[in-house]
Amino acid sequence: MRRGWKMALSGGLRCCRRVLSWVPVLVIVLVVLWSYYAYVFELCLVTVLSPAEKVIYLILYHAIFVFFAWTYWKSIFTLPQQPNQKFHLSYTDKERYKNEERPEVQKQMLVDMAKKLPVYTRTGSGAVRFCDRCHLIKPDRCHHCSVCAMCVLKMDHHCPWVNNCIGFSNYKFFLQFLAYSVLYCLYIATTVFSYFIKYWRGELPSVRSKFHVLFLLFVACMFFVSLVILFGYHCWLVSRNKTTLEAFCTPVFTSGPEKNGFNLGFIKNIQQVFGDNKKFWLIPIGSSPGDGHSFPMRSMNESQNPLLANEEPWEDNEDDSRDYPEGSSSLAVESET
């Protein structure tokens, strides 16, 4: 009886957490919808008097708004990618590992299993990176998110504002979302500013639109400052080919710690996120090279690194399609030892 109540309570808490995790997204959506109304109707259709100016403002605004909304949608609804089945322990290996009580034997078991996989990063103690919750050997740059309850390929962070884990599958979209958000706020601020001055000087009648125009400038400037800092930080990460987690915790390779282990040079670093074809760099469609399991590394020469030698490290003929759990609103990654 008591166990049933505990299970029901636990299920209810999980349900509440899932609902609450969408609150930050709802806040952003409501702010954006209000900004659309304030700019299109209160500014362009009511306050701006010149027909030509109205048309120019509306065309440019909607062009930016489409890409802003598109990238936000992709950041939210592009599911995080998990390691495929080759990195999961088989049922037999899982039972052997769980039943083995000697830590040194467990470590050796993981070492033997990892020899068959393209895994070059280690824990701080030099052990094979293993997730005891997902029961898999973690690919390079993969981390477990305790919020999403799964391992995420090339995990950057868990973002509450998109209610999703940002990783290999959607980092490009997230970066584009930041860029178009900055552009969106900057465009609103620059076009609204002259009318803000006119209202301030009393050159325009004090009507209902005054509140929307004045508050629109304030909100645009506030978001612009915070977003440009975040966008600048992620641009720096891309230029170094780092994730947020790698910036805080230096990756450890088989040869030892190396903070620039994935740094291939500025252009190649950008291509690792956006791909080789520049015409796709501004469009939110998947163009990041690779499969998220293996990455070129600066710390290895071409004879050691199959990706730099243009060779396939391993083949996967199995169907790896699956449903991934939904994320929730906090940042949580397992600690590695």
UniProtKB/Swiss-Prot annotation:
Residue numbers on the Lumenal membrane side: 42-56, 194-210
EC number: 2.3.1.225, 2.3.1.-
Residues at which Zn(2+) 2 binds: C145, C148, H158, C165
Impact when changing C159S: Fails to enhance DLG4 palmitoylation
Matches recorded under InterPro entries: Palmitoyltrfase_DHHC, PFA4/ZDH16/20/ERF2-like
Main localization category: Golgi
Protein name per its UniProtKB record: Palmitoyltransferase ZDHHC15
